[in-house]
Amino acid sequence: MADELGTTEREIIAQRLKKAEALRALGVNPFGNGWQPRHLADELLRHYGDQPAEEIAKDPGDWSLAGRVLAVRSFGKAAFLRVRDRSAELQVWVKKDRVGEQAFEVFKLLDIGDIVGAEGPATRTKTGELTLEARTFTILTKATRPLPEKWHGLTDVEQRYRQRYVDLVVTPGVREAFVKRARIVSGIRRFLDARGYLEVETPTLHKPEEAGGAAARPFETHHNALDLDLKLRIATELHLKRLVVGGLDRVYEIGRIWRNEGIDRRHNPEFTSIEFYQAYATHEDLMRLTEELMHRLAVEVTGGPVVTFQGQAIDLTPPFPRVSMLEVGARALGLSPDDALAGRGLAEALSRAAARENDSEDAWKLEQAAKKTPGEAVALAFEIFGEPQLPKDRPAFVVDFPLETSPLSRRRDADPRLVDRFELFAAGMELANAFSELNDPADQRARFEAQMRAKAAGDEEAMPYDEDFVRALEHGMPPTAGEGIGIDRLAMLFTDSASIRDVILFPLLKSRD
């Protein structure tokens, strides 16, 4: 195996291409097929555990593994390889007198990053490391471009995201984070399936009047054959509720959502959500279900109910505390909840709050809130002043949402100024949004009309008027509660990832100039 240090990448690639030709000369296809491992590295490691060499020698087995070479220590006629498959890393010992002259000639053409196959018994070396002692050895795939093995992973964060295929190989913990993400999704599926929910698929391309379900700006496209303007969905909500009207009392969808908005450590324009709807349930029922789901996922994915996020321990043991948006938002403005919702003294309170706000963007938002409804102003005050004060060591349900913030939520019977809604926050992030669904078609029509007025006044995130959805409600939707959970942020929490890009395999990035 040649030393590649000190040469340019172009020279290394040229060297490796020559080695690929040398493999062909030996009768080995450097990009062959048909060699299948019978075992995983983790199986061998678990089988022998901490058994001493003497015990392993009594039953060394016949193991067959394949994986990528991460490191090589060569000693003339023998070498130790670090090989990783999808389960674990394992040391492989290649000796000329064990694998034979032909196979050792193949080995000498090996480079870090190559994918190899090896068969042989298990042993424990003098240094105490559990090892596969190769009886047969071959190169299955020649890597013609080198891995950045000189460094402990990629040092350029942008390069990590652009070349995730390399990041997964060389950066510690990345593979494990995405394995956890997959376990989160499968855990949610098991949880809902066990409770009688039906998984469905709804359209991702919406006609302009259907592109609702959230306050967000959609991406737009055009269908050439139908000469039809379309929008990528910003939520699955309205189609899922149509299914509840049709008698599918418990439905859910895990799917991609697109929102034409900014990018930061918690937002990506393309993300994954789970939305589920249950007839004959209230938002209170979903609070209890959410507590149970979060606790179970924490145990299944991390091994216990307490997770650590950026140095902060967060206990997901139910019940979760509740925080009133109305109470906190109004008090932050120096008003009583009743005065705030009635708009009494609200403009002056917003002006005072803006004057003392250090963040210029938040100050501008507070000034502009005087043009919005009182409920929207209270919600903004909570976002700016209340969210940073939410519990750090526990998730929390935010409740008592003003009516104007929730065009699809059911009014609260005891106080029609509010809606039956909650949001779940943890680690400073909104993880879930849920409410008892509005099923009064006349009320829904009126709220859509209010949204259209807001859109005409310049609100690009206002929802369109979906006449077909109102028609569906006129056929009768049973009392229903629904919830949406952001899979990506949930993965951030359970993998201790500071950026949403760390839990999306291929996040959207700017084009390189």
Swiss-Prot record:
It catalyses: tRNA(Lys) + L-lysine + ATP = L-lysyl-tRNA(Lys) + AMP + diphosphate. Keywords: Aminoacyl-tRNA synthetase, ATP-binding, Cytoplasm, Ligase, Magnesium, Metal-binding, Nucleotide-binding, Protein biosynthesis. Its main location: cytoplasm. The keyword Repressor does not apply. The keyword Ribonucleoprotein does not apply. It is found in: Cytoplasm. Binds 3 Mg(2+) ions per subunit. Belongs to the class-II aminoacyl-tRNA synthetase family. NCBIfam families: lysS_bact (TIGR00499), PRK00484.1 (NF001756). This is Lysine--tRNA ligase. It comes from Anaeromyxobacter sp. (strain K). The gene is lysS.
